[in-house]
Design a protein with these regions (language model features):
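Short helix-initiation/N-cap motifs at beta->coil->alpha
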Residues: 4-19
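Detector for C-terminal structural segments
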Residues: 18-147
Length: 147
């Protein structure tokens, strides 16, 4: 097995399709950063409609070209449901299909780091939020907060 490594600049790697390597899907294997604002990537990023193509002006997050009608259906129904509806459980089905097919392999998670003074209480990093001040209304400081 051979591997020819190409290190592109961000400008070149993320160039629009059809000629750009990532969005033009001109690669056998690609390592790139994808930003997430939740604990896992959104299922909608890997639906068939998100494959970059001429029809969508080469804009889409599914650069792997992953296609699975069962995944698409579960994801779309889950995204259109509320937490108290039965269809919301289809997020788990979409995740199970994703884990089985593995169209993308997460290499590492972005660490969330913060610091607070010793007499500061109520502060905790929420893994489901992008904001370290998400629970600001619960913050306090003073002698009653000392460890």
């Amino acid at each position: 097995i051979g591997l020819n490594t190409i290190y592109d600049t961000a400008v070149d790697l993320y160039a629009p399709g059809p000629t750009g390597p990532l969005f033009g899907r001109q690669f056998d294997l690609a390592e790139y950063a994808i930003g997430v604002n939740s604990l896992e990537p959104q299922c909608g990023w890997f639906t068939t409609s998100q494959i970059p193509a001429e029809a969508n002006s080469w804009v889409g997050t599914n650069v792997s070209g992953y296609k699975n009608p069962a995944f698409d259906s579960a994801c779309q129904q889950a995204l259109q449901s509320l937490p108290d509806e039965a269809e919301y459980a289809l997020h788990q089905e979409a995740q199970a299909i994703f884990a089985s097919d593995l169209p993308s392999i997460p290499l590492y998670l972005r660490l969330k780091v913060a610091a607070a003074r010793p007499d500061f209480c109520g502060f905790a990093l929420d893994p489901s939020s992008s904001y370290s001040l998400a629970g600001i209304e619960e913050f306090d400081y003073g002698d009653s907060c000392a460890p």
